[in-house]
Amino acid sequence: MRSSEGAPSWAVALPPPLRPCAYGVSEVTRCWHQLSLGAGESSMNPSATLYRRQNIGSEVETSTIEKQRKELQLLIGELKDRDKELNDMVAVHQRQLLSWEEDRQKVLTLEERCSKLEGELHKRTDIIKSLMKKVKTLESNQAECQTALQKTQQQLQEMAQKATHSTLLSEDLEARNENLSSTLVDLSAQVGQLQAREQALTTMIKLKDKDIIEAVNHISDCSGKFKLLEHALRDAKMAETCVVREKQDYKQKLKALRIEVNKLKEDLNEKTTENNEQREEIIRLKQEKSCLHDELIFTVEREKRKDELLDIAKSKQDRTNSELQNLRQIYVKQQSDLQFLNFNIESSQELIQIHGLKMEEPKALECSKDMCLSDLDNNYPKIDIKRERNQKSLVKDQTFEVMLAQHNGSDKSSCDACREKKLQVNTALGEKSVIALSSLFTKDLLDKQKSWSLGGKIQTEPENKVTLCKVHAKSPKCDGVGLPTEEKQLSETSVSLSDEKQWHDINVYLGLSSCSKQPDRLDGDGHDRTGTSEVSCCTPNVVCIGDNDLSESKCCHPSNIIIEAPGHMTDTEWMNIFKPSRAQRIVRHKTMCTCSRSVSAMKYNSSASELIGMQPSQCVGSLKSAEREEESAALPDRRTSANEKDDFSPTSKLQRLLAESRQMVTDLELSTLLPISCENLNRSKLEVSEEPDEKTTLVSH
């Protein structure tokens, strides 16, 4: 498993790949001991040996991490296959149980049916036996009945013969009676006819005598009537002449009356037309009266509404002014906090540089060895560090994400400077200051007071991809004071981990750990502020990289981060800040860290809904091109899955709250324009109401 200890440091064999189940941190510490023992011969060049050890340790760690990832992926695939097989087995077993229960129920039902049918069969057999007995008795009765029938049939035949003789005799007697009755009818009919003729003759004679007497009397009456009619004719002729004369007179009178009636009709038509015109004028006047009344009412209401709108606009203006003053005060506080943070960072860097000049190289080597071993043995937990005076400060952002832009790297940063800073941090400071970036969210801006809550949110891409990471910067002191400080920090983690579960206060920690910087200053014009860049953070105890790899490994030291805060601003600029813009403000990092753990964390925990705890790791040199291509191909797929999960995450809720707060600010800004718009609406309504009035007047005319 291990190579010989006496071999030179250049020929030290690397340990085989470590499995996560069989090997752990202790095996890595053994490897480091082996490397330290093998490097005893080359004590003449401590900087070169330290550099080689760090490179070898980083390669070992990267190889173990990659193999552990592959094994974990294989184990996860096997577990998924086993889970599918178990699910299939359970489904088949459940189906068999269901079929068995169905068959059992069917058998029980069939047994019940069989028992019922057997009982019915016994009953039917008893009934059949009783019926057989009845059939036998009926057969005996039937035989007796047949004998009685034969006797009765013989008696019936005898009676039928007697009946035939009696019917023949009765027929002969009936024929004789019919002949006698017909003769009697003929004789009676002849007698009746003769009597009727006698009566008719006597009545005819009497009627003829009466007719003769009546005719004589009628002739005498008619002669008298003719005389009277002649006298009446004379009188009628005289009356007719008089009537003709009167008729002519009446005709003349009728013509005169018709002429008068026509004249009266013409007068009546003229009067009706005049009456209709007067009615139309009355209706038009009534309409004008109603329109004038409505206009008066509208004018009164318009004046009232104008007064109300003016009052509302004044109150809204006062509200907006007060809210803008509060926003400005908060923004000024944030700016002062940022300036204080920058001052703390500069002072800490100066202290680090001054202390690094005083330190000596052998102490640096011993401290680096102890540091590496302690970092590998200790699995750093996530610590929610409280705000203290000169160590920590909270930067509050009111309605938008804190813009992290590029910062000009120092020209004199190199591997030696990083090492000196690390030693100074290990010996002098003990604990690093942490910048907690949090965003404040507004709730009920119009009705309630503004309640701001801390929530960490760094927007890294324009597609609203948010990566939240925690970097805990800790380093034990070289002079033996590191152990009690680490125990204190572990006691603080137990309290902070319970607080980290609350999603409403999400703290984003960026460690002030020493890391390798690029000696050449990056051009600010070369990087787009609107381009997409992911924020990745390095942890403490990071080993410097060679000069050839500095162009590829860009570290995420807090000195590379700029928090831009504007100075004095006008009202329009303040309103433009709080407007929801299409181009989202983007957190952009100047350099891209190549920490192996940070890359893995960004690969596997790219969703914005999860807090990514970054464990301490060492910066790796130039990665192989094949591995980078695989990582670049795997990142977009995971980002798409992260976007699907992002809708249900607490960070998405925070983004929605930010959007709502921005919308409220825009509504407050637009509320000042309400009186003008209301007046325009009232004018348009009045114009629309005046147009139908004009149409009604035209129709009435």
Swiss-Prot record:
Keywords: Coiled coil, Cytoplasm, Cytoplasmic vesicle, Nucleus, Repeat. Residues 61-197, 241-342 form a coiled coil. Highly expressed in testis, not detected in other tissues (at protein level). Expressed at low levels in the epididymis, lung, spleen, bladder, kidney, liver, muscle. A motif (LXXLL motif 2) lies at residues 670-674. It is found in: Cytoplasm; Nucleus; Cytoplasmic vesicle, Secretory vesicle, Acrosome. A motif (LXXLL motif 1) lies at residues 654-658. Residues 636-648 have a biased composition (Basic and acidic residues). GO terms for biological process: blastocyst hatching; cellular response to estradiol stimulus; estrogen receptor signaling pathway; positive regulation of transcription by RNA polymerase II; spermatid development. One of its GO terms (molecular function) is nuclear estrogen receptor binding. GO terms for cellular component: acrosomal vesicle; nucleus. Residues 624-652 are annotated as: Disordered. Nuclear receptor coactivator that can enhance preferentially estrogen receptors ESR1 and ESR2 transactivation. Also modulates progesterone/PGR, glucocorticoid/NR3C1 and androgen/AR receptors transactivation, although at lower level; little effect on vitamin D receptor/VDR. Required for normal spermiogenesis. It probably plays a role in acrosome formation. Contains 2 Leu-Xaa-Xaa-Leu-Leu (LXXLL) motifs. The first one is essential for the association with ESR1 and ESR2. Interacts with ESR1 and ESR2 in the presence of estradiol/E2. The interaction with ESR2 recruits CCDC62 to ER target genes, including cyclin-D1/CCND1 AP-1 promoter. Interacts with GOPC. This is Coiled-coil domain-containing protein 62.
